[in-house]
């Protein structure tokens, strides 16, 4: 039987390129992850007759993931944008053009229990940026990039989304670990 615990905060978010079913590139850390929210997108319908609802249809058809981080990280932006990233000793430059293809990625997040004894990991194995990539630069405020992704079904191995609750503090990896621990 599952233990009921409370989870607080966001300890880690990672992103990796999606190379195929259950195949991912190297996991990259979203530095200063501030928010990761996941919403199920549900298709619904109902049959009505005799002044009542006779049947209800509901099916999860995708997931929406919103991410916000504390740093402007061009490497992370390059992974999701399909742009061209070049760097030298003086600068990093990410160029996005009309012919760039937005890539599928995998995203995973980690929250710790309020007593520090276990972890909750959330894994969206295949998603693509689906909303605006937001930057707000203004006087007296930090810039916090934010993006919205749409997750699709990857297949039988990982589905659309996984929630894995570990019985001990556990390092976040893509794909998700199957054992507890930080090493």
Where are these regions (language model features)?
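Solvent-exposed edge beta-strands and adjacent loop segments
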Residues: 2-80, 127-144
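Ordered hydrophobic segments in well-structured contexts
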Residues: 4-17, 103-108, 120-125, 160-162
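Surface-exposed ligand/attachment interfaces on beta-rich extracellular proteins
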Residues: 47-51, 87-95, 179-183
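Acidic Ser/Thr/Pro-rich low-complexity disordered segments
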Residues: 21-25, 108-117, 163-169
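Structured, beta-strand-rich domain cores
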Residues: 64-119
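Membrane-insertive, pore-forming/entry segments and their flanking low-complexity regions
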Residues: 1, 6, 11-14, 171-183
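Mixed-charge, glycine-accented linear interaction segment located at domain edges/termini
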Residues: 123-183
């Amino acid at each position: 039987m599952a233990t009921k615990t409370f989870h607080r905060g966001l300890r880690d978010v990672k992103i990796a390129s999606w190379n195929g079913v259950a195949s991912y590139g190297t996991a990259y850390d979203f530095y200063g992850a501030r928010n990761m929210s996941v919403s199920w997108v549900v298709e619904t319908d109902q049959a009505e007759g005799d002044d009542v609802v006779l049947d209800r249809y509901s099916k999860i058809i995708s997931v929406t993931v919103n991410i916000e981080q504390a740093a402007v990280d061009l490497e992370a932006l390059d992974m999701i944008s399909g742009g061209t990233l070049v760097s030298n000793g003086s600068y990093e430059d990410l160029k996005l053009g009309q012919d760039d293809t937005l890539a599928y990625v995998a995203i995973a997040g980690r929250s710790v229990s309020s007593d520090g004894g276990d972890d909750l990991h959330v894994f969206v194995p295949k998603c693509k940026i689906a909303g605006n990539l937001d930057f707000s630069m203004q006087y007296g405020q930090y810039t916090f990039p934010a993006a919205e992704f749409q997750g699709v079904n990857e297949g039988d191995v990982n589905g659309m989304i996984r929630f894995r609750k570990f019985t001990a503090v556990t390092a976040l990896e893509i794909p998700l670990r199957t054992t507890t621990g930080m090493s």
